[in-house]
Amino acid sequence: MGRRLILDTTVLIAYERETIDRSALDDDELAVASISVAGYRAGIELADTVDRAAERARALTAITSTVDVLDYTEATAAHHGRLLAHVRRSGTARGAHDLIIAAHAAETGRTVLSHDAKARFGDLPGVTFLDARSLATRSS
């Protein structure tokens, strides 16, 4: 078994667009937070064409059928609260959804895989980060 990873929404989008080397994740244990599924579903709802919405829906089904979808539980809330307190004390603004993803990562001992280096997941206590740009396909 390879790495234990949690994919954020940017990676779901890269999966759909085929701009990430999926084979690089073959040996890894993958999960996605339900908040990321919600963010991706918003993209389905906002698609500019019916065909595009259908493509996105198919991609999401393919992803969620092969990875664990993590629900927000009381244990997740405990990690989330700790991270909220940390960012408030440090005065560093963070995305609300990013903190939920980070809470799942801390709770489950997973590394956050994201294209969003600005989210600074690795700066959060108990959270590790892997830059998904290292897994980009050659054409992206």
Predicted segments — roles?
Residues D26, S65, L124-P125:
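Short, structured coil segments at secondary-structure junctions
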Residues D8-T9, Y40, H80, A105:
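Generic structural signal for small/hydrophobic residues in well-ordered secondary structure
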Residues M1-S36, A42-T61:
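Short, well-structured N-terminal submotif of metal-dependent ribonuclease cores
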Residues L7-D8, V32-A33, A93-G95, D116, ...:
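Histidine- and aromatic-rich ligand-binding microenvironments
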Residues R3, D68-H115:
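Active-site neighborhoods of divalent-metal-dependent phosphate/nucleic-acid chemistry enzymes
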Residues A102, A106-S140:
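Acidic, PIN/NYN-like endoribonuclease modules and their adjacent C-terminal/linker elements
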Residues L12, V37-Y40, A77, K118-R120:
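A generic structural signal for short hydrophobic patches within well-formed alpha-helices
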Residues L30, V69, G126-F129:
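Conserved beta-strand scaffold positions in the cores of enzyme catalytic domains, especially
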